[in-house]
């Protein structure tokens, strides 16, 4: 987790210095065209995990300014895909097997597909919807914007002294062009690992709750 957090901070810091991201061969967007959002949605293939899957789906359905037709879903896990399909969202790709055994190679392949669509102008923004793992009993649904990367200008200014020590070879924009594919792949893989841990924790909590409720009901019936 610290590695992936540092990756995000580093790319954001570079953007604070360069001020933009220019991806190789990216087609200029027609201002009259809607900005389509490519969203990687990480859920599970099974139920019995409390609100784990529905909470991830709500990260998308709860965006009031997002039109259903402007969202393109890349689903990892069947449960999130099923919820979003019922809500009318377009699922372009589905990878139910990836969440069973998360691997960096799978994250890299998905990253390449997304960046190809981004460069072609088919999608204008890339998001990642997953469950952030805090500990075994605490998990937080999280929507992270991957591209275009947003950074805090004030935070960038506050670290100006540190940034001044950074030298880019080649130039910063060229460096970003090389880093962005690894940046996207790393964040997808990190989210997969966190989601897998969160799913296990959520399922344990759900089963513990079900067991506790069953015992309470057993005691109640026994008293009657």
Explain the meaning of each model-derived region.
Residues 1-223:
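C-terminal beta-strand-loop-alpha-helix "lid" module of Rossmann-like NAD(P)-dependent dehydrogenases
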